[in-house]
Amino acid sequence: MSLEQEEETQPGRLLGRRDAVPAFIEPNVRFWITERQSFIRRFLQWTELLDPTNVFISVESIENSRQLLCTNEDVSSPASADQRIQEAWKRSLATVHPDSSNLIPKLFRPAAFLPFMAPTVFLSMTPLKGIKSVILPQVFLCAYMAAFNSINGNRSYTCKPLERSLLMAGAVASSTFLGVIPQFVQMKYGLTGPWIKRLLPVIFLVQASGMNVYMSRSLESIKGIAVMDKEGNVLGHSRIAGTKAVRETLASRIVLFGTSALIPEVFTYFFKRTQYFRKNPGSLWILKLSCTVLAMGLMVPFSFSIFPQIGQIQYCSLEEKIQSPTEETEIFYHRGV
């Protein structure tokens, strides 16, 4: 079963889905538009949404939370003093896609990103011997990234399953190729410069992550994504907004993987010069893994918070066919994760 089919066959075709009530506005979209959070508030919000327990929330609990958010007119923000409302918003934002109102597959929810990515990034940055040991971590890393980017991206446009599958395959192949280049260069030429050996994998990991986002979400800039007014009403589909959404996500991934890969390399460089390392050389891998997990643990919510989930764009920047039916000066679009 493909990832797209898995997403569609989730048991949670949730209350208030867009095809059920024409005037319905997705609660998650309403939240991100009305909150207009600062970077600090977005960061704190993401630290809650990235709680690993959000991966295991039951469908029944999510449906009950959605029912509360969809039927209670007084529910407007998780800042409410009511603990039930706070928990309902957390469950909804962490598990439901804003464009389709479908449940996000458990393995590709934002809360699952760090547990999967941290050890995989560590393995992909570790010098290994043998072609299989070099390629397999990169394939897994790039395949998971492509699936995560696609599932959590904007899904407001129509797309054939074959079209999306081909793009996913291209994203995995191209980013994997970029990711393995440093390892093959090292195996063939035996680079000796300490900083070249450390920085080359970081540079190519950044390139691979950027390529992955661009390829897996390129349909957003080709077909266009839905743009909305401040009430959440869809005004049309814009390629310009789609391109902006992809660029913002690409920039956030570069920050995430570049920083998360660079920090462990810097720490290990200085650690290898200490007396403790000379006595305990095996501790290097423990330190590097710990640094990778800690760096990604900080950088995942940081990178997800750089840009708002619901971005803004001036109406005069959009296509003429969208400008004409509205007098709004600020238009909104779902950027995706």
UniProtKB/Swiss-Prot annotation:
State its location(s).
Answer: Mitochondrion inner membrane
GO CC terms for this protein? intracellular membrane-bounded organelle; mitochondrial inner membrane; mitochondrion; nucleoplasm
InterPro entries, alphabetically?
A: Mtc
**Which Pfam families does the UniProt entry name for this protein?**
SFXNs (PF03820)
Keywords, sorted A to Z: Acetylation, Amino-acid transport, Membrane, Mitochondrion, Mitochondrion inner membrane, Primary mitochondrial disease, Transmembrane, Transmembrane helix, Transport
Q: Does the entry annotate any disulfide bonds, and if so which pairs?
A: none
Q: How does it sit in the membrane?
A: Multi-pass membrane protein
Q: Which GO terms describe its molecular function?
A: monoatomic ion transmembrane transporter activity; transmembrane transporter activity
Carrying N-acetylserine, the residues are 2
UniProt cross-references to PANTHER family, sorted A to Z: SIDEROFLEXIN, SIDEROFLEXIN-4
Question: Family per UniProt?
Answer: Belongs to the sideroflexin family.
Which disease does the record tie it to? Answer: Combined oxidative phosphorylation deficiency 18: An autosomal recessive disorder of mitochondrial dysfunction characterized by intrauterine growth retardation, hypotonia, visual impairment, speech delay, and lactic acidosis associated with decreased mitochondrial respiratory chain activity. Affected patients may also show hematologic abnormalities, mainly macrocytic anemia.
Report what the protein is called.
Sideroflexin-4
Q: Which organism is it from?
A: Homo sapiens
What gene does this protein come from?
SFXN4
